[in-house]
Design a protein with these regions (language model features):
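Short, charged, intrinsically disordered terminal tails
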Residues: 8, 162-167
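Non-DNA-binding regulatory cores of transcription-related proteins
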Residues: 89-153
């Protein structure tokens, strides 16, 4: 391959400008599902890394390798700091980490939220981080309790209808 258009300095510096992923200051509570997801992600990243290291010679590929290595450092740090919480050990009377909580808002709409670890949170499927304002409002509460969910667009009052834990 002709090297006429290759910026040698840029090629050697590939991956140097990758910013580390921030690690949360909070305890790293994870559900069994969350721990498995992190382990699966670690395996996937290792496979991608092996493939790219065997086939990459260009700057883009070296940048991609640096990104994967960065993500791998993050995932390994999260696995090392993981505090596994088994839902079976939680009180079914109280909203605790790992709970799926069914609530009703002031207009009668019923919603379900699953309180999970920070790396597991996904608002599109109603999995909320245990450090989120919603989870903080729900944690420690019982069925029939009313809580206020403080949101930037306005507070909502929620009544807890049901609490359960996946086994």
């Amino acid at each position: 391959m002709s090297r006429a258009f290759v910026n040698e300095e840029r090629f050697e510096q590939a991956g140097d400008d990758i910013v580390e992923r921030p690690i949360s200051e909070h305890p790293n509570y994870v559900t069994p599902t969350g721990a498995l997801s992190l382990q699966t992600l670690e395996g996937s990243l290792l496979e991608q890394l092996d493939t790219l290291k065997d086939t990459t010679e260009d700057t883009f590929g070296k940048d991609k390798i640096a990104e994967i290595e960065r993500d791998l450092r993050y995932v390994r740090a999260r696995l090392d700091s993981a505090i596994l919480v088994d839902p079976k050990t939680q009180s079914h009377e109280t909203v605790l980490f790992g709970a799926t909580v069914e609530v009703k808002d002031g207009e009668g709409a019923q919603l379900k939220f699953h309180i999970v670890g920070e790396d597991e949170a996904d608002a599109t499927i109603n999995k909320v981080s245990w450090v989120s304002p919603l989870a903080k409002a729900l944690l420690g509460q019982k069925i029939s309790d009313t809580v206020t969910w403080q949101r930037p667009v306005g507070d909502i009052t929620l009544e807890i209808l049901d609490i359960h834990y996946e086994s």
